[in-house]
Amino acid sequence: MKKYNDMKRKVFIAVMSLVVSGGLSGQSVYPGQHSGKLKKETIAPMQVKSFDLKDVRLLPSRFRENMMRDSMWMASIEVDRLLHSFRTNAGVFAGREGGYMTVKKLGGWESLDCELRGHTTGHLLSAYGLMYAATGSELFKHKGDSLVSGLAEVQNALGNGYLSAYPEELINRNIRGTSVWAPWYTLHKLGLIDQYLYSDNQKALEVVIRMADWAYHKLKPLDETTRQKMIRNEFGGVNESFYNLYAITGDERHRWLAQFFYHNEVIDPLK
């Protein structure tokens, strides 16, 4: 039993390392990557540029062993489990045979009483894109495509471009300045941009642009006092997501959204 627990602990550490590194490299757009997909390139002089994951393969090594171990875990997760809280929020289970009760639920942060639900799905959506780029395995392409299709279905059911595993009321609570657990941070981690950049999923880009349209119409009418009150709540790096989307689309509304999340109280004292 001890040996089994030690093995589980090692796998958990390895998986979390992938998730953390995927969050760093997958959520950012580095100069030199994603040729042909960016309308706004970096104009600052760069001495070193990054490379695309698809252009590199790991040779037999501890790193490759860990990557393949992680890939086995990622491959084992059922897409329906990752979508269950999103589908529940949109009410789409009503049209499915067996409905909600047929899905084996995720717990912890993904439980339906947790305001961070949807977080794990987003991290894995990024990870599937990264793993597909790093290995070329169509399995991870299929996993990512299936998740994106499921999320698009949820977005269509919700109707206004909003997409999440929790009700829009959590965003409204954030805007009012009342207690809520990081709804913008969870949207930041959703991973749709990564699916477009790393897996060439055009539908993922369409879904995230609709989300940005919703966010723009939601936030544009807010005054400065309301904005400052709203961003006192943890919002992660959602501004980075909007800047990355702006780099892809060139749409000035996406840059406006990124600038909207400029946190004066934190950044200004550092000047």
Stretches found by the model and what they are:
Residues M1-P31:
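Bacterial Sec-dependent N-terminal signal peptides
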Residues Q27-K271:
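Glycan-recognition and catalytic cores of secretory/periplasmic carbohydrate-active enzymes
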